[in-house]
A protein has these predicted regions:
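Solvent-exposed beta-strand motifs enriched in subsets of small alpha/beta binding domains
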Residues: 151-194
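Basic/polar, cationic surfaces and motifs that engage anionic cell-wall
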Residues: 68-157, 194
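Short glycine-rich loop/turn motifs that provide flexible caps or phosphate-binding loops at active sites
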Residues: 2, 107, 165
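Gly/Ser/Thr-rich beta-alpha loop segments that engage phosphate groups in nucleotides
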Residues: 5, 110, 168
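Active-site-adjacent loop/helix surface patches within enzyme catalytic domains
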Residues: 1-99
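A short pocket-lining beta-strand/turn micro-motif at the edge of beta-sheets
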Residues: 61-63, 104, 159-161
Length: 194
């Protein structure tokens, strides 16, 4: 569950194992049971997620996210996070004009290790096959979603898509988050009361 670390994998620590680490996002179950993506870094910031290898570091070249493995054998949970991850990658490929099927665009941690740009870690190669999936089927799913989502470019320059970073019942908490978001460079951020 996002915000909870019952599996002792230590992402929720300041410096797990003495290392400073941070992925760009987590995908997992919320307290209400739904699956969501929780962004922890702006997409254009360098993360500290994959380590390095003999040919450099995936941290310098890739956006990363961690899929919380709440239930390695729970098919419903797997399908929900797999779908969420595919939708996230679809959005990122669209945003950055990337071909999900191009070599090295979407890789698992273990594939980064094989390329010499990441530490030796199995994700998601140990989990996807348990549910009949692979990184190849994942990339194909992203390509399918990307093709389905392609729509004619709007000529209306005033159409905006907004991204919400939180919902708070205490105004002081909303003010604190707004301050953090603006400090991170998002100067047009604002609070909307509803």
């Amino acid at each position: 569950m996002l915000g909870k670390n019952q599996y002792n994998n230590h992402w929720n620590q300041d410096k797990p194992g003495g290392r400073q680490v941070c992925v760009h996002a987590f995908i997992g179950k919320l307290a209400n049971g739904t699956v969501a993506t929780y962004q922890t870094l702006p997409w254009n910031h360098r993360g500290w997620h994959g380590g390095s290898g003999s040919k450099g570091s995936v941290n310098d070249t890739h956006i990363s996210f961690e899929i919380c493995e709440d239930g390695l054998t729970d098919a419903a949970y797997f399908n929900a996070v797999y779908k969420e991850a595919a939708e996230l990658c679809t959005c990122l490929c669209k945003e950055y004009k990337l071909d999900p099927m191009a070599d090295g665009v979407i890789i698992g941690h273990y594939e980064g290790h094989k390329r010499g740009i990441a530490s030796n870690h199995a994700d998601p190669g140990h989990w996807f096959p348990k549910h009949g999936k692979s990184m190849d089927t994942f990339r194909a799913e992203v390509e399918k979603l990307l093709s389905a989502n392609e729509a004619p470019t709007s000529t209306d320059p005033k159409k905006l898509y907004r991204v919400q970073v939180g919902a708070y019942s205490v105004k002081a908490n909303a003010d604190a988050m707004l301050k953090k978001v603006k400090a991170a460079g998002f100067k047009d951020a604002f609070i909307k009361y509803s």
